[in-house]
Amino acid sequence: MTDQEEAKLILDKLNEKIRYHDLLYYTQDSPEISDAEYDDLCHQRSIILEKFPSLNSYYQDYIGGDPDSRFSKVKHNERMLSLDNAFNKQDVEKFMVRTRKLLDMKENESLCFSCELKIDGLSFSIIYKNGKLFQASTRGNGYFGENITNNVKTIENLPHTIQNAPDFLEVRGEVYIDRNDFIQLNNEGKNFANPRNAAAGSIRQLDPTITAQRKLKYCMYTIVNSNCLTQTESLNLLNSWGFCTNEHTISTDNFEEAINFYNKMYNNRSNISYDIDGIIYKINNIKLQHILGTTSKSPRWAIAYKFPAIEGKTKLNKISIQVGRTGVLTPIAELAPINIGGVVITRASLHNKSEIERKDIREGDYVIVKRAGDVIPQVVDVDKSLRTVELAEFNFPTACPACGSTVYQAQQEVSIYCMGGLFCHNQILEKIRHFVSKDAFNIIGLGKKQLLFFYEYGLITNIIDIFTLEEKINNKNIQLSSFNGWGEKSINNLLSAINNSKVINLENFIFSLGIRFVGKHIAKILANHFISYKNWYTEMLKLAQDVNYTINIQQVGLKTINSLRTFFIEQHNLNMINNLVEHLTIIDAQSNSYVSLIHGKTIVFTGELSSMSRSEAKLKSETAGAKVSSSLSKNTDFLIIGNNPGSKYKKAQSLNIQILSEDIWLQYIQPNKV
């Protein structure tokens, strides 16, 4: 595999993570990670795309998240872009140097910047027609936003009509909520994580009367396609029309003055009634903005210099251990409640055992808590001057607090892991979710909600239970159809999906076990190397039984080998695998000498097959070396038809694609050794 192919695999994973967190942040207003962690994901992607520019055309930059389906969509006349971020003074300087270079400016030519607060709220756009408010929308994914017109009309001091405005006017700004209003909102029984989420959730209410009660504020920052000469002039014009703009704005052509403005606002941020998370630097000259243009994601003429996280001091009452789905034991600080940036913090991450020892953190200490990215709190230091009595050192557990299994710490790693694997109930639900996922057993209809249901009723408490589910339901005389969400069709579909999944290829089986460092790519390498389940299992037992035994496979490193060894040392995992394979047919990986009549061909299925399910047919075809597609094209080699074929049959005839019956296809997939 080439470096670029490996980079593409990494980018696939990064994009999947980024889109997932975009959905949580922009659409559901419930982020799971900090701004800093999200920025790091985007930064990793930028580094790879910079190294492999040809991959840029393969990946479309999405902005934000897709519009909430509860609201009608609004197509933006011009894309609502996001901003590139700077995290230190050097990043800002690089931006300014790059900008001057793009503009082909001489050293003695001045370049003026507008310096504005980055308010932590929700971006929105308003269109006025003939001076009257016509439509308001969120940013959404940059192309389409959500129609929030009626909600925006409830915001105090926002003009519904404008005097002396052009016939068509689009302005953009930020909706936010003051910290005190946010605290009051939560005191009234709401449960927003922070002011930004409160503002975003309030503006997305289906009932505008609820929005009207939320004391939302706004700040306008741009006129789309403005005839103004400068950003400063645009802000003044917005003011003259009656819009709120931010008073904390300066323009300067001096780099140090721009940085001083950042430092001043960072130091005074607690005196501002609303949350800000950085300073935005914009080229002040609008003509130069147009010359610089944009990338697919952000303008080249602006950058956001992000603030570091907010900190506070409180007492650490207790250190508890949380066991994650990968088995990592994460120490958690149970804190005396502290309000940081308008959010009451009671728990914070201590990262790992090494961090506790390095910082000498003890129960009863007063600790410095930081909200990384203003979202996820973590303990960053201890105020030992307040340690007036002798406090006991914290002893990290030597057994998993959830299941009692042995814990281990790999060489050159800081994390400590539970060896319980699928025996550990804290890990089990997430492990099972991985087990049934698309790239593993691909059991459709067994998602998070369904798994939790079966787990709570004791029907699926380990992966073996999946394949005895029907028997358990019958033995316990449980009428699934009497429960909400379970109809006869959904039950039959699920049981059928489970039954079909019992035929699985070796690489998917290896991947399904969720062994650390064994992702899709490594699982495929292992499968292609060992060919059969028996060969693979035998070698894994050798690894577990002899610490000096190893396997030599290209791209399978020492970390992966040690992880495999650790997994197979644990008797719980061996018992699980041995019980599991009794329910399965594990298809050997295709060797290099394997050929069939459909090897290397692109095929499509239509109609209902009589001998097997569609998913099983897909697996058998792929094992025989074919590529299975869901749609016909001029590149399709064969269309396989079952009973009651659909419209693909006629389309295949019109495209002169060869059509095979199910019986002929079964002959074509037979392997031949050469």
UniProtKB/Swiss-Prot annotation:
Statement: the UniProt record of this protein carries the keyword DNA repair: yes
GO biological process: DNA repair; DNA replication
Binding positions (Zn(2+)): C400, C403, C418, C424
GO molecular function (one): metal ion binding
Keyword line: DNA damage, DNA repair, DNA replication, Ligase, Magnesium, Manganese, Metal-binding, NAD, Zinc
Binding, NAD(+): D35, A36, E37, Y38, D39, S82, L83, E116, R139, E174, K282, K306
Cofactor: Mg(2+); Mn(2+)
UniProt keyword annotation of Lyase present: no
Highest taxon, organism lineage: Bacteria
Catalytic residues (UniProt): K118
Known EC number: 6.5.1.2
Record-linked SUPFAM superfamilies: BRCT domain, DNA ligase/mRNA capping enzyme, catalytic domain, Nucleic acid-binding proteins, RuvA domain 2-like
Record's catalysed reaction(s): NAD(+) + (deoxyribonucleotide)n-3'-hydroxyl + 5'-phospho-(deoxyribonucleotide)m = (deoxyribonucleotide)n+m + AMP + beta-nicotinamide D-nucleotide
GO CC annotation terms, alphabetical: cytosol
Alphabetical list of InterPro entries matching this protein: BRCT_dom (IPR001357), BRCT_dom_sf (IPR036420), DisA/LigA_HHH (IPR041663), DNA_ligase (IPR001679), DNA_ligase_AS (IPR018239), DNAligase_adenylation (IPR013839), DNAligase_N (IPR013840), NA-bd_OB-fold (IPR012340)
One Pfam family here: HHH_2
Enzyme class: ligase
BRCT domain ranges (all copies): 593-674
NCBIfam families xrefs: dnlj (TIGR00575), PRK07956.1 (NF005932)
Family named by the database record: Belongs to the NAD-dependent DNA ligase family. LigA subfamily.
Family annotation (PANTHER family): CHROMOSOME TRANSMISSION FIDELITY FACTOR 18 (PTHR23389), DNA LIGASE (PTHR23389:SF9)
Known function: DNA ligase that catalyzes the formation of phosphodiester linkages between 5'-phosphoryl and 3'-hydroxyl groups in double-stranded DNA using NAD as a coenzyme and as the energy source for the reaction. It is essential for DNA replication and repair of damaged DNA.
Protein name as annotated: DNA ligase
UniProt source species: Ehrlichia ruminantium (strain Welgevonden)
